[in-house]
Amino acid sequence: MAGITDGRFCCKMTSLGFDLLTLGGYNADHNAIDAGLKIIKRGRLEFNIAKEDLYHHITKEVKLIKNQSHYTGEVSVNLRSSSPDQIIEISKIPELDIVEINAHCRQPELIESGCGQALLKNPEILQDFTSEVVRKCKKKVSVKIRANVHGVDDVMIAKAVNEAGADYIHIDAMKPGFNCADYSVIESVRKNVDIFIIGNNSIRDLKSARHMLKSGADGISIARAAIKGTIPFDLTLV
């Protein structure tokens, strides 16, 4: 959650049973940073970190989490960028476990800059983008996508991410007009790819968490339900 999930926020999550905590999304290149500034001007939360300071900033945030002695999980960072270069650069942070390509955020400013959801418009471009990150970084790679975007074939996108060699596909199974996830998207993707699926959207209790896993996700992610620094159910019971 941009402007929210920094190291201090993630530290609140370290004792709740998560095996992965994700920082970001951070605006990683000049196009994304410029878009982020426009978003801030209209009153939305964003991380505002200069490109030349981002490596040091994320390093500090990752170390803050890893220094929690009771936390033995991994740390990921979600990055918005119109090109792979800065994502590859951030992947060099020694303490970081996973870089996540943001093909998910739908703010108009980001889409116009070629970031976030804009990457879903052409599966070949997304595959090439992801392949370059996979090829040139030595960390695990995740790609976060948004489901049910007009004109986008979710299965084709998942196949592109899979073919690119990513380790994870993180699916926001958004169901427009409904206050629940579109579990059928997870089912369709599961039938077509072998990649590790992280299911996201409206996971707020044991029922929704179990439904996501039953639909074919290998793991779940929680965002808004954790906004107060805790979660409303016991992860060990999922």
Question: Where is each model-derived feature located?
Answer:
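Hydrophobic faces of well-ordered beta-strands that scaffold small-molecule active sites
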Residues: M1, D19-G24, G73-L79, V99-I101, ...
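N-terminal capping/small domains of soluble enzymes
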Residues: M1-D85
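Catalytic cores of alpha/beta
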Residues: D6-S15, P84-E95, V149-E163, K191-V193, ...
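Glycine-rich phosphate-binding active-site loops on the catalytic face of alpha/beta enzymes
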Residues: L21-N31, I98-L110, A164-F178, S215-T236
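Active-site-adjacent beta->alpha loops and helix N-cap segments on the catalytic face
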Residues: A32-L37, H56-V62, P84-Q86, C105-K138, ...
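Helix C-cap/helix->beta junction micro-motif
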Residues: Y71, K136-C137, A164-G165, V193
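Well-ordered, non-transmembrane segments within structured domains
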Residues: G73-E112, I125, G151-N162
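Histidine/lysine/aspartate-rich catalytic loop segments that bind and position anionic ligands
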Residues: K139-S142, R146-K175
